[in-house]
Amino acid sequence: MEAGMKHRILLALAATGLLGATAFGLYGIEGRAADSGETMIVDVPGVPTAALNAEIDKLFNEDEFAETRALVIMRGGEIVAERYAPGYDRGTRFISWSMAKSVTAVLVGLMVADGRLALDAPAPVPDWQRPGDPRGAITLRHLLHMSSGLQHSEAGDPPYDSDEVRMLFLDGRDNMVRYAEGQPLEAEPGSKFEYSTNTSVILSDIITRQLTDSKDPDVRRRAMLEYMRGRLIEPLGMASMVPEFDASGTLIGGSIIQANARDWAKFGEFLRNKGSIAGNQFLTRGWVDFMLTSSPNDPAYGGHIWLNKPRAAGLKKVLYPDLLPGDVFAAQGHLGQFVIVSPSQKLTLVRLGKTQDDVLDPVKEQLGRILALFPRD
């Protein structure tokens, strides 16, 4: 069978969900995986291969970029560079941390497309719908834009005082959504940006309650897992993806979904292609456009995803507004997890590792230098 015909058949199978881990372009390296410590690079017209290899070497070998564990770069749907640190390989699952938020946003979009949720209706949280509760004004749009107005601290000093840590690891951990949904308002919904992992757990609960009325943790877990598998994991061929749940059966949709580097790249490609796989629309283009449109209170944040836009004075730069195209966007997670997508360059870059957040800037800058080596269309 000639290579072109094989390529078309693989794409057709991907579109039907019948093709597991090969659902997206592994063809640039013919399905081969880089051995630990080795960089696999495909020559790309207009890209200086030696310079690309050198910059990737720095990312893995120089102390200021430690600890990079995996890198995958896709261009035009094909893997053009891939590398793993010793002890890791293409089968290794990596924790998402906050990259999970963007997965949760996609699940919300599927629910909206199905007519089960509405973006600007009051968020269907029963406790908020009691007469006189001001939280009844919170909408899905507010939650996706991190502007619910709920009282929240994402990072505290000491850390165990933060609402995020309390929900994930301390007094809220067994029923995370009860902790998250139980917070009072501290601002009018829609009036300010407040980055919140707890908000994504609220969205996870809202999705789950559209799937089942049961409060049984196992039933809730199964309902969400089946929905994710049928609508996202299998169509995208992300066979390694493992969502994590708390003791009450709620998806930890703000921080704990695991997948290997190639599957995270498939997720980025899915968004780069506006929710389409091989010409088949699995998520509406309008929803992806919503995710990639600046929120009112922070232009660098969309619908549960970061955008390559300047921020207000005093706020830290998130991506590369002075270096890369304005349509760049990224799912980012604690300790240096990145899925960075540049539609103008037909690129998706995944970097996974463990770098403390207070020394992460050099890693982020190095990823920008790598992306800048690729031409724009």
Q: Model regions: which residues?
A:
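A short, well-structured edge-of-sheet supersecondary motif
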Residues: K58-Y88, V339-I340, K346-V350
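Active-site SXXK
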Residues: G77, F94-D120, L143, L203-I207, ...
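Short, charged, amphipathic alpha-helices and their helix-cap/turn boundaries
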Residues: E78-R83, P159-E188, V219-M241
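Active-site helix/loop module of the DD-peptidase/beta-lactamase fold
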Residues: I95, A113-S153, G182, T212-S255
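Active-site Gly/Thr loop motif
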Residues: D174, M238-F245, T293-T348
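Active-site-proximal alpha-helical segments within enzyme catalytic domains
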Residues: T199-I207, S255-S276, Q337-G353
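Structured C-terminal helix/loop/strand segments within mature extracytoplasmic catalytic/sensor domains
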Residues: V328-D377
